[in-house]
UniProtKB/Swiss-Prot annotation:
Pfam family, one: CRT-like
Gene Ontology biological-process annotations: amino acid transport
Region (Disordered): 1-30, 404-446
Location (main, coarse): membrane
Residue ranges that the UniProt entry lists as topological domain Cytoplasmic: 1-52, 105-124, 171-178, 227-237, 344-352, 398-478
Biological function: Nutrient transporter. Involved in maintaining the osmotic homeostasis of the digestive vacuole.
Subcellular location(s) per record: Vacuole membrane
Listed name of the protein: Crt homolog 3
Keyword field: Amino-acid transport, Glycoprotein, Membrane, Transmembrane, Transmembrane helix, Transport, Vacuole
Membrane topology: Multi-pass membrane protein
Length: 478
């Protein structure tokens, strides 16, 4: 046996050293795994296109303006704690000049307000303004003695109440996901109210006014449903609608002052005190305190009957109130503009997700002492539990809304159309067969119906549209 034969198999040299060397040297180096930071950067580069970047900016600005809007409104309620009725008038009449100028421009400088819109029955605006006035009255008067986090949780009750109103007046039907989500939302609202039910007045909450605030969702839900009924067959300009709604809302809001005569403190206003209360509210708007503490001359303690002794009679703190009012009105207008932009460019699904994000963010801001000062509301176990339940219920409701099922009525209509066309469409089916199996008749694009355009319009306004009605118009258009 030669020396080569005694070598191990892998050591045999057949003169291919150059080949083996070349083969080893040309092997592909091992692929390095991309780091998470690089993956994130590449994802951002692919996502940040000219189309998606504006949408992301709109959504972020909507969330930011929404949080600021809620926080500023609560700070205004704290400033006007003794003048809740005056605050409700400011939040109504303050927007009238803005909407009037915008409507005038739309009517006389553009063609956005046609004759059909101008001839729209005024009584429908009156009913809508009445419902919105009652809603705003309950929100402001009840919100003065309801903490910021609890306000945001109670606001979510409008979803189940709107479902009930839609079921009664529109005969709307809902899926099990939507019904389950609404039930969980109501459970979260009840859990959030437990501290007030058990502990009475605490954390700036007064039980009576917590329920007073909660009642506001009833006229709010009725307003949503009425808007769906009243604007059944017309596409209306946003600014035109906002002006008339704001006008009638302000007028009806002004005549609601007798209700304060029977309300407990701090919202009590006797009939003879309405004018002095409005005057003192105007002074508070200018930064002047009217209700001041009274001290004992000898002990330097608060005298009997002075403000500040209990939560039902609070001293004025009107410093820089007018600045907060101006900032709030500016942010509120921007907030409503971003609502339209998000709905227009991102759609209702992204809008719903953004609303869900706003809810926990506002509760976080209400717990920061630097922002809320003495009105800071720390987290509690029950408030966190209520928040989680409501978020879970909102998720279930949104999932149920996104599940598209053809409504039974549209299915029956299509079956009836097929049945009616069974005898009369024989010629058309024969003609189609004569063209051959491979021939296809081009599908014509059907024009959008007035109902479909109206639903799009209200979606941009942020008005809830029953899912089956919106899907029905899509089925007709498709």
């Amino acid at each position: 046996m030669g020396s080569d034969e005694r070598k191990p198999l892998l050591s045999i040299n057949d003169g291919d050293d150059d080949f083996n060397h070349q083969d080893v040297s040309t092997k592909t180096p091992p692929i390095k795994k991309e780091s998470l930071s690089n993956k994130f950067k590449s994802f951002l580069k692919k996502s940040m296109t000219k189309e998606t970047l504006p949408i992301l900016i709109y959504v972020l600005l909507y969330i930011i303006s929404g949080v600021i809007n809620v926080v500023l409104l609560k700070k205004l309620m704290i400033k006007f704690v003794n003048y809740g009725f005056f605050l409700s008038q400011i939040t109504n009449y303050g927007y009238l000049p803005i909407f009037l100028v915008a409507m005038w421009y739309k009517m006389y400088c553009t063609s956005d307000v046609p004759k059909e819109t101008r001839n729209f029955p005024q009584y429908k605006f009156v009913i809508m303004g009445l419902l919105d006035a009652i809603n705003g009255f309950f929100v402001v008067i009840g919100g003065v003695s309801t903490s910021g986090p609890l306000q945001q949780l109670l606001n979510q009750a409008i979803i189940p109440f709107t479902m009930i109103a839609s079921f009664i007046f529109l005969r709307e039907r809902y899926s099990l996901f939507q019904l389950g989500g609404a039930a969980v939302i109501l459970g979260g609202v009840i859990v959030s109210l437990i501290p007030s039910l058990v502990g009475g007045s605490s954390g700036g909450n007064i039980l009576f006014y917590n329920f007073f605030y909660l009642i506001s969702v009833i006229p709010g839900a009725l307003s949503n449903v009425y808007k769906d009924i009243a604007f059944q067959s017309i596409d209306m300009d946003v600014w035109y609608l906002q002006f008339w709604d704001c006008l009638y809302q302000s007028l009806f809001g002004s005549i609601l002052f007798p209700v304060n005569n029977w309300l407990p403190p701090p919202a009590t206003i006797k009939f003879t005190e309405i004018i002095p209360s409005m005057r003192d509210g105007a002074l508070c708007l200018g930064g002047k305190n009217t209700i001041l503490p009274i001290f004992n001359g000898t002990t330097s303690t608060l005298a009997f009957g002075s403000c500040g002794i209990n939560d039902n009679f609070v001293c004025d703190d009107c410093h820089n109130t007018w600045i907060i009012v101006l900032i709030y009105m500016t942010v509120n207008i921007a907030y409503n503009i971003f609502i339209l932009l998000v709905l227009k460019h991102a759609g209702a699904t992204v809008y719903s997700i953004a609303n869900t994000v706003i809810l926990p963010l506002t509760n976080i801001f209400f717990s920061i002492h630097f922002i809320m000062g003495a009105a800071t509301t720390p987290f509690s176990a029950l408030s966190v539990a209520g928040l989680l339940l409501i978020l879970f219920g909102l998720g279930g409701y949104r999932i149920g809304s996104m599940i598209k099922k053809p409504p039974p009525d549209s299915k029956k209509d299509s079956e009836q159309q097929g049945g009616e066309g069974g005898a009369g469409d024989g010629d058309s089916s024969d003609n189609k067969n004569n063209l051959g199996d491979s021939a296809e008749i081009p599908q014509q694009i059907q024009p959008k119906t007035q109902l479909h355009l109206r639903n799009q319009f209200f979606g941009r306004l942020g008005i809830d549209i029953p899912e089956s009605r919106y899907r029905a118009t899509n089925i007709i258009n498709n």
